[in-house]
């Protein structure tokens, strides 16, 4: 800070004079141009006094020192680009920062007094002087830059030329428009703050530190130019119009007065037009006033000063007309403007082409700049280059076929590509664009920083090897692109999440991590690669911890190792790197000075004690107890675990499937890991690495999404963990534990052979689709669900089918079903038949017993298939069914015991053998309405046997209308139990005393409809008998071959519909007899048909063969005879009476005769009456099964259909030279002469016989027959029927005949 520009009132001069910043207080303020000149004159008279009164003052009355430091170092909440930032103050209230994206302070040098403006240039204040340590040697990150020249301008603005391109930042490349008036500046650079647009600027510096707390100032004079102590704030610009910018450093509560040592640091404003931060100026001095107010003065950005220096060190090389530009002995030739004056200058190439080194070229502080989107080739045998570095601007590509000097580091910037094709034997520092490693061990070491650079492998062993493979990811990192090559690391030297390992090639890469001790990788992994960590044996303390992120569709594989995925403890600024030390003996330790860190901590000890947040002042980049953690997202295909441990820690979001064998999985692990060097892991000049891992307990929210397949393993899901098993869960000999506070949701089903212990929450649902409708999911537990805590919750809803017993001794909660569920929530991609079979029409089905006498259960729209004695404290049942049934291991009757039962609109279905039954026992309270009792009807009681079987008991005075009897359909009967209510001194009971049974008309009708499928198939074959060959009249050939295909659909009542496709081929021979032509032949057929109705569906495949004869009389009469056998393979699924799916075979015989006579009305028009009679045989079938324990059977015997048909066809022919087409139409009446077969149904109530019925229908058809030449005929006919119980809706018949 300029020491001579503070103002004090002088009794001698009667006005303000300039004195040192370190002098006493100011009593007035200066105005007027003459007064400024007078001040400057007095400045150089040496009116200086020494004091700390106006050193840096961070106001920590309600803010922490760390807040100001985080601010300047882009740490904590102050990340570059962040918005809506709120600082939590010591009193718990918040301060919201101005409404603007937070600036990136990376252009600010480590010591704060200089700012990079891109390339090899920086700005500062002139009064700092060239020889000042913070100007002569400037540092960003782990790199040191030497000033080689500078240019200055009035009043105090300086721009420096450095010896290297700065790789750590792109720099603050633009300045504010200083020609604007204050009002114009407000419009362009103003931001909203506390509801008002204000001209606010942001700053960072590391001047002499003091803190102000409740008006008291505590100095730390020894602290200045320390990179760790870089601090900042935002200020209000009070004056823009003069040659200085004046800022009010105390206009708001978050105030931090610029100090000695801040001189030259930049003032940033937000350009609302360009949507970026620009530099308004550099610190010149401070005005301090008697009233305690403070203004900082900034020299305005001077573009001309910058451009003059850049022009001095730039040399443009236009290669558009040159074949080769040659550099030899420091001289550039071949470009049309040969020169020797290029030393220390940036050679700025345009036009593309070749650059040839004919000797080694040391360009001092000058670099090579490639300025357009062209390709350049730099060649030169074994000659070397040395200079400021390589800048590939504007997407240019440079093929680098020379070597860089091995005693220097190559600096690479620019968004283009540097394609390195020779081993360099030196180090690379890159911060922008792409570097391609095209040679073995291309560089000794690579330092990548700023987050804008990529290094891509393009050769085997392109990295140098060693512990870190010679690549070091410094602040904000960059990308290593494996480019299809495999790469292994012992450790990846990465300091933050800016480090990225990826593979952009379509060829998969394998990234192997082989750490031999605990190690944290702070970066990210993504792209087309697999991640492997395989060890021969399992050892402790070599855990791999990922706290950055993973994003790949490929797999991760672990063997004999430990892996943790967790979030990252947010990094914060520290006062000092390391502890205070003094090597002097005790009597002389005062010479080492005080421990300023302890002093700073002491100033905030009271706030830390009150708020319990020691992490605010503990001088550590992070702490396990801090509340702010960054969430890491880890997305992969499948994680394969073999004898390994995998944990998901706090603030991790893991997305992927897991396959585990002999492994341990922990989701929500309370053990967390931090690195006390995070953000500062890269050491020295950028080619060293350190870590200090601290392990301890720290809890935060954990997310897991995916599926798990595990064998001989353990799974533990802990407090604050949320697991969404969106894919299937398969647990073989694997115990799963859900601890208190864990929340687990499964969607795609689960199978487990071991107990699942639940202290937290387990929700089982169906699988949702994009419309939030659900496919049913099955949850099968061969062991039990153990509810081990009072807070345990077991939930099933949204089309979940759950199997497994439930056990608990705790006051746990069981919640099955969903209030709003109905079949409309079923996903459109789900078979309704499947859903009905799994869920029984309910939202949830549960099969198992519940032994939880202290637990409470709620069942809404739930089908509980109770398979064993069960006990609950309370049960609330709504729109549900409790269905007592047996299991493979328990055939006994069961008792459900409940202390309190509230039941409404529910059913209780029980079994009985007419002497014993299932029971419902309510101990303390029973309430509800509209509930029904159903009792299985397994056998019919004899008239002399009087039933009196207790089904339900409840405390006396219970309303006897809670339950009522209801009929149920079992088999083919409607069965209504007779329920009698009795009340005694201590209880009320509902008992079974008899049954009423009647035939269920719908069930019998459904059975008859199913068995009628064979008749309809017979009828379709009948309709095919006489449609074989087309029109046989006037055929000249002696023999023929033919083929036909017929496809049709039909329908009947009860929702019946069928469709069929019939294919038939045949051959025949013509016999010319006296007065007639006789055709005899052989045919084979194949038919695919399917049929469905409201309660069944299925398909039939049929094959058949037959013989036929057709006589065509010269008089116009004809007779057609056919005999045929057909075999049918059937598969039908029925949903009535529990029939299920049946596979069975049947067969049928056909004998048909048709006669007709064709009368010619004219030579080419005719009318043809017809009559047909078909007699056949259809084989019978029989099914036997159980429905709800009742034995059922249904059968039909062989029967013989007899079907007649009469009708008339009319037609007209059209002919040409060698063709003839006949159009025809027909109308007929088809009728059954004999009823089709009888169906016999039997259940526990007796036998029911369903007589076959006759049917008839009207047939209608239109068609065309065509003759081409004498031997080719084909036809097409359309047909349908009406007025029948069964009708052909549409049928099309196509035939083709070839005669020879």
Curated annotation (Swiss-Prot):
GO CC entries: cell outer membrane; cell surface; extracellular region; periplasmic space
InterPro entries (alphabetical): Autotransporte_beta, Autotransporte_beta_dom_sf, Autotransporter_pectin_lyase_C, OM_autotransptr_brl_dom, Pectin_lyase_fold/virulence, Peptidase_S6, Peptidase_S6_dom
Maturation and modification: Cleaved to release the mature protein from the outer membrane.
A Pfam family the protein falls into: Peptidase_S6
Site (Cleavage) residue list: 1023-1024
GO BP, sorted A to Z: proteolysis
Signal peptide limits: 1-55
Residue ranges occupied by any Autotransporter domain in the UniProt entry: 1034-1300
Record-level Gene Ontology MF annotations: serine-type endopeptidase activity
Keywords annotated in UniProt: Cell outer membrane, Hydrolase, Membrane, Periplasm, Plasmid, Protease, Secreted, Serine protease, Signal, Transmembrane, Transmembrane beta strand, Virulence, Zymogen
Inducing factors: Expression is optimal at 37 degrees Celsius, and inhibited at 20 degrees Celsius. It is dependent on both temperature and pH.
Catalytic site positions: 127, 156, 263
SMART domains: Autotransporter
E.C. number(s) listed in UniProt: 3.4.21.-
Regulation: Inhibition of cytotoxic activity by phenylmethylsulfonyl fluoride.
CDD domains cross-referenced by the UniProt entry: PL1_Passenger_AT (cd01343)
UniProt-listed Gene3D superfamilies: 2.160.20.20, 2.40.10.120, Autotransporter beta-domain (2.40.128.130)
All residue ranges annotated as the Peptidase S6 domain in the record: 57-311
Function: Serine protease capable of cleaving pepsin A and human coagulation factor V, which may contribute to the mucosal hemorrhage observed in hemorrhagic colitis.
Additional detail: Mutagenesis experiments show the presence of a linker region, which is required for the translocation of the protease domain across the outer membrane. This linker region is located immediately upstream of the C-terminal helper domain. The signal peptide may also act as a transient membrane anchor that prevents the protease domain from misfolding in the periplasm.
Entry note about domains: The signal peptide, cleaved at the inner membrane, guides the autotransporter protein to the periplasmic space. Then, insertion of the C-terminal translocator domain in the outer membrane forms a hydrophilic pore for the translocation of the passenger domain to the bacterial cell surface, with subsequent cleavage.
Name of the protein described by the UniProt record: Serine protease EspP
Organism for this UniProt entry: Escherichia coli O157:H7
